[in-house]
Design a protein with these regions (language model features):
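Conserved class I S-adenosyl-L-methionine
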Residues: 108-117
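Mobile active-site "lid"/loop adjacent to the S-adenosyl-L-methionine
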Residues: 142, 164, 181-213
Length: 273
């Protein structure tokens, strides 16, 4: 199977490995037919279709890395996307509704972006009028990418800081320093065993601790967006008891996504005293 995503005037066509094996010639013919079908259905030129597929007979290298990249526009914001080189493009389309909600509500807010990836939520917040922000991730690659996205949108990095840190450690330090935010986005991976982290991350196991840490930084009338893409995920009952939680997944997943379980998303607030 393939996933077809439209980025402006380009199509990102990604093959998913099901273990189905074909001879090399048969496989190449099949790929050509897939591209021909996409051209027919979408009307895009073959030159604007970026095929990301399994390389064959290339040892441990699983995907082609041709490295073509360029800018993409979303709701008036500019983003640097790479449609060929990496498994991900730099901009997850399934969260474009959530990004717009952040941009629409950021005016005058202090914003925090945890597990920030390439900083797209911060781009929306900053261009939406946030007075300050902190963008936190452990990956230098993604933080450099975020900086590039900031530059594309004229965002001042003195006012909108990019911070390399383990999120667990950041939450502890920020709480000790008395930092407060009005709007927080936390979109962690389902699992991570990065050597840069002191411990592994298992979002089902660890999400309550992460949410508690984020809520300790959230102003009394603030809002946390918490999301993840673990299909089997269930929100900890203690979290639902401690805070006001609202599942907005049906609104956050765009209508044009066939897979309505591509992520789950909650609005979380402090309970009124």
């Amino acid at each position: 199977p393939f996933a077809v995503d439209v980025y402006g005037e380009h199509i990102h066509l990604q093959e998913y490995d099901t273990g189905w094996l074909m001879a090399d010639d048969e496989y190449e013919d099949w790929l050509a037919q897939v591209i021909e079908a996409v051209v027919f259905v979408t009307g895009f030129s073959p030159d604007d279709i970026h095929l990301k597929h399994r390389e064959r007979q290339k040892g441990t290298q699983q995907y082609e890395k041709t490295g073509r990249a360029g800018e993409d526009f979303e709701h008036g914001r500019r983003f640097w996307v790479n449609l060929d080189k990496y498994l991900d493009t730099g901009l997850f389309l399934d969260h474009r509704n959530t990004r717009k909600k952040v941009g629409d509500s950021a005016e005058g807010k202090r914003f925090l972006n945890l597990f920030s990836y390439t900083g797209s939520f911060t781009v929306y917040a900053a261009t939406g009028g946030a007075v300050s922000s902190e963008t936190v991730d452990l990956s230098n690659t993604y933080l450099d990418w975020a900086k590039r996205n900031f530059e594309l949108n004229g965002i001042d990095t003195a006012q909108h800081q990019i911070i390399r840190a383990d999120v667990f450690q950041y939450l502890q330090t920020a709480s000790q320093e008395g930092k407060r935010f009005d709007l927080i986005v936390m979109d962690p991976p389902s699992f991570s065993n990065s050597k840069k982290m002191p411990d592994t991350l298992d979002i089902q196991r660890d999400h309550a601790r992460l949410i508690d840490g984020a809520m300790s930084l959230l102003d009394s009338d603030g809002l946390l967006y918490f999301s993840n893409n673990l299909r089997s995920f269930t929100l900890n009952e203690a979290v639902a008891q401690r805070y006001e939680t609202k599942d907005i997944s049906k609104q956050s997943v765009p209508d044009d996504f066939r897979n309505k379980k591509i992520h789950q998303c909650w609005e979380i607030r402090h309970k009124a005293v």
